[in-house]
């Protein structure tokens, strides 16, 4: 027990508290009861000629002693807590490492031997089948081993499986692996892509013959200076040259077949339109082939 205490100003060099502390060091069982007499029959200590000076203390002095002892007690309790936390953390880390090792052993070990990337075997069949670096085809995919546990239990993807893959609940969202299957048959597409040229945003190279065919004669090309350019004329040229829509035919005063770039007649409803928009010839059934002749 510390007998020299840093007292506050009003309790400095208080002999009462010092006497009380000296008396406490005699009473409290520390180092097998020093400075005490023991009877022959009993092992319990007997303090002789001890006048208790603690009872002479003021209320203020007693509260100070209480706070002092409480402070020491709290410090020791905190030290005990820290040591207990360290031991608990060590045991928790050991158990966590064991569980992590168990879960890692369940999963397949990829590159377990730490060999370089160039020596890891890859599936060359995927490169042959999929030369444009798309995904693996749907039929070659394997259901994940923990599919039953993880089914609809993922925060990022409600299905876990990609839409269109084998285990997916819906295949109409859109397939991840887009490739042309030559063994598919039947019409897949009802609309055709745009046949017309896209508008040219580059600096124009004017073709006088084409402009004359389109009856555009506002400004001759050879008389137009390079540094001064008429915005209105060029915008009209842009409209008449590179945009051909049905509402603008009266501007260009030229008639042409909108379907001349297609390899078949799109208004023939009996023709098979393949998914990749390429003609493969033939009609759907023998009856339609007969009434075609």
From Swiss-Prot:
Keywords: Coiled coil, Virion. Its main location: virion. The keyword Coiled coil applies. One of its GO terms (cellular component) is virion component. Residues 65-89 form a coiled coil. It is found in: Virion. It comes from the Viruses. Residues 81-112 are annotated as: Disordered. This is Uncharacterized protein R463. It comes from Acanthamoeba polyphaga mimivirus. The lineage of its organism: Viruses, Varidnaviria, Bamfordvirae, Nucleocytoviricota, Megaviricetes.
